[in-house]
Swiss-Prot record:
The family this protein is said to belong to: Belongs to the complex I 49 kDa subunit family.
Keywords (A to Z) from UniProt: Chloroplast, Membrane, NAD, NADP, Plastid, Plastoquinone, Quinone, Thylakoid, Translocase, Transport
Protein name in UniProt: NAD(P)H-quinone oxidoreductase subunit H, chloroplastic
Species in which this protein is naturally found: Barbarea verna (Land cress)
Source taxonomy: Eukaryota, Viridiplantae, Streptophyta, Embryophyta, Tracheophyta
InterPro entries per the UniProt record, alphabetical: NADH_Q_OxRdtase_suD (IPR001135), NADH_UbQ_OxRdtase_49kDa_CS (IPR014029), NDH1_su_D/H (IPR022885), NiFe-Hase_large (IPR029014)
Gene Ontology terms for molecular function: NAD binding; oxidoreductase activity, acting on NAD(P)H, quinone or similar compound as acceptor; quinone binding
Leader sequence segment: none
EC number: 7.1.1.-
Amino acid sequence: MKRPVTGKDLMIVNMGPHHPSMHGVLRLIVTLDGEDVVDCEPILGYLHRGMEKIAENRAIIQYLPYVTRWDYLATMFTEAITVNGPEQLGNIQVPKRASYIRVIMLELSRIASHLLWLGPFMADIGAQTPFFYIFREREFVYDLFEAATGMRMMHNFFRIGGIAADLPYGWIDKCLDFCDYFLTEVVEYQKLITRNPIFLERVEGVGIVGGEEAINWGLSGPMLRASGIPWDLRKVDRYESYDEFEWEIQWQKQGDSLARYLVRLSEMTESIKIIQQALEGLPGGPYENLESRGFDRKRNPEWNDFEYRFISKKPSPTFELSKQELYVRVEAPKGELGIFLIGDQSGFPWRWKIRPPGFINLQILPELVKRMKLADIMTILGSIDIIMGEVDR
C-alpha cells in the first residue's frame, strides 16, 4: 500500500486478523490522520481452502458436505445451489413436496443468518443486550434443523432431485409455533433497537451507498436493496416454489447502515410469512410418513403421485454432468450466491466457479470508510455482513 504524500504525520494501524469485530480472519491495514480514515486495504485469503479445486475432483454427492463450510451460518443455501446446477443440467424434476420443504428450510436458514448478523452487529457498536436475545431465538431454529436433518449446523440435507429425508412427526406443528412466537420477538427487537437514539446516532448516515453505485460495484442482497433497488432473485428467477407464495421485497432508499439493518429486520418477517404459507399448503398435508402410505395402494392410491414424494428418482453416484455451461444462482441472506458450472460428460465438473456475495460486497469497504471516523469502520463492516469462509473459500 502506498503512503499518501502529505505534510501530516499519518498512522498505519493493523486491524485483525484476530480482532473480534472482523467476523473471521480478515485483516485491514488502515491509514489514519488522527481519528479520520485516509485509506483502508483489506487483506484476504487467511481462510482459503481451495473449495473450487476440490469440486473438480469430487462427484456432486461427495462434494455436498464440503459446501456447508462456505457460509457456515447459512448452509442450506450453499447446498441448494450445489444441487440446483446438476438438476438443471440433467433436467431433473423436483417433487412439489420436496420443493416446499426446501423453501421452508431456506427461509429458516435466512432467519438464523440474519439473527446471527444482528447480535454481533449490535455488539460491534456497543449494545450487548440484543446479542443474548438473538441466541435465544436462534436456538429454536437450530432445534428445528436438528429434528429434521440430525444436525444443528452443516446439515447435508439437500439431494439432487429432492431432500435427504421427509419431515419427522410433529415437526410442522413445532415450526408453526415458532413462527407465531418469533413475530412477537421481532416487535421486541424494534422497540429495543430501532428507536434507540444511541443506535440511530451510530448508524444513520454512515456508509451511504447510492443505487447506481451499488449496481456498478456488483452489490447484491440487502446491500443492494437498502440502496433503493428492489431486486430479489426469489422474485426475478422464481426458483423452487417462491412464485406460489404471497410476499413482498423489502427495500429502503437511504443506502446507509440503518437502511441495511431495516431491510434485514423486515426480511425476517417476510420469511415467516413464506414459511407459514408453505407449511399450510404442503402437498400431502401434515402427515409426514408419506413414504409408507405410498405402499397402501388400495385405500390411498394418490399417495404414489410424484408430487407427494420428498425425493425423486435418485441419480446414481456416477451421475454424469452433460457437456455444457451453466450459471445458477439463489438469493442467499448476504446476496446473490451463484455457481458457474461446466460439465464435461463426466461425474466430476470440469469447472466449478463460486460467486460468493460476501466477497463482492466486501470490495466496496475501502470506499465507504474513507473520510469516516475509525469507530465507524466497525459499523460499516458489520452492516455489510460477511463470513470469511465464504469470502476466501
